[in-house]
A protein has these predicted regions:
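Intrinsically disordered, low-structural-confidence terminal and linker regions
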Residues: 1-24
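Conserved alpha-helical substructure of the radical SAM core
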Residues: 30-196
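Flexible cofactor-recognition loop at the NAD(P)H-binding site
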Residues: 126, 215, 287
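Radical SAM/AdoMet-radical enzyme domain recognition
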Residues: 140-160, 166-279
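Conserved small/polar residues in nucleotide/adenosyl-binding loops
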Residues: 280-288
Length: 288
């Protein structure tokens, strides 16, 4: 697909996604019909039929979640995220990845994780970043080169970890703006989230966050430091106000697993605007 064809297909896709907002039950099937015609046999039949059931069937587990996304997330921002995820990451990315996997006879990842910096403004118990030092950094040009080479192979999805990646929020925003055909997700402690940053997220339209939190205030601050829990909730408040998409990343331990899997915890996170949750185990630092 040449540049003209790519632009034309994305333009049609953008209009269909925008159109689907007006009447999801009627227009989502039309959007998926277009997507299926474009993708051919690249994906399974369920890829295109399952979303229709989600939209129309109130008994479907994902039904309320789908409509909450439409209500809670900024429309232009969400439309752009959906288009980039479906077309650039899903269609173009998958097609290129599969081709290059055959050429190079090796796996090529659909998503790449990178640490812009090992620097962090917290010192959480057991965190490798707190033990290994704060002086390791990826230069902006190095990250640019990594993304450029990854896109050539078919990877259009990038995750930022650390350290605390928002220590380098300026560089992250630059990368997002320079690569509108990519999706970016930053794992962050949330303490550096502010109104200005959220406004930039909405301008980029391809960045979302996963905030670290670990259950109750007691279990969270026992490992992350006094006052961090309230700062994380404040970050959620700001992100929700700006209608940005965000989730949480939970590190589970023997000390907090009850707290981070309780209905009370889930209900509170949902009320605070959280749209996804991922669980990670504790990675202890080791000597080289």
């Amino acid at each position: 697909m040449n540049n003209f064809e790519t632009k034309a297909v994305k333009t049609v896709g953008a209009k269909l996604i925008h159109y689907a907002y007006k009447n999801p039950q009627k227009n989502v099937p039309k959007l998926l019909k277009f997507a299926k015609r474009l993708a051919g046999n690249m994906f399974t039949e369920a890829t295109f039929t399952a979303p229709i059931d989600i939209v129309n069937n109130k008994e479907n587990t994902w039904h309320d979640y789908f409509y909450s996304m439409l209500d809670d997330i900024d429309r232009d921002y969400l439309e752009s995220l959906l288009l980039t995820f479906a077309f650039d990451c899903g269609y173009i990315g998958t097609k290129t990845l599969r081709k290059n996997r055959e050429i190079y006879k090796c796996n090529i990842p659909w998503v790449i994780l990178m640490d812009p910096t090992s620097a962090c403004n917290l010192k959480c118990k057991g965190c490798w970043a707190a033990e290994y030092g704060h002086k390791s950094n990826l230069a902006l040009d190095d990250m640019r080169r990594l993304i450029k080479e990854a896109k050539e192979l078919g990877t259009h999805f990038f995750m930022f970890t650390g350290g605390e990646p928002l220590v380098k929020k300026k560089e992250i925003l630059t990368l997002c703006k320079e690569n509108p055909d990519c999706i970016f997700l930053a794992f962050t402690n949330g303490t550096l989230v502010d109104d200005a940053f959220c406004e930039e997220i909405l301008k980029c339209k391809n960045l979302s966050l996963a905030l670290s939190i670990e259950g109750s205030e007691e279990t969270n601050d026992a490992r992350r430091g006094e006052g961090v829990y309230q700062k994380t909730l404040k970050a959620m408040e700001i992100l929700k106000k700006h209608k940005c998409l965000f989730g949480i990343s939970v590190c589970y331990t023997s000390q907090n697993y009850d707290a981070v899997t309780s209905d009370e915890f889930y209900d509170k996170m949902i009320a605070n605007g959280v749209k996804s949750v991922s669980y990670t185990h504790l990675t202890l630092p080791t000597k080289a």
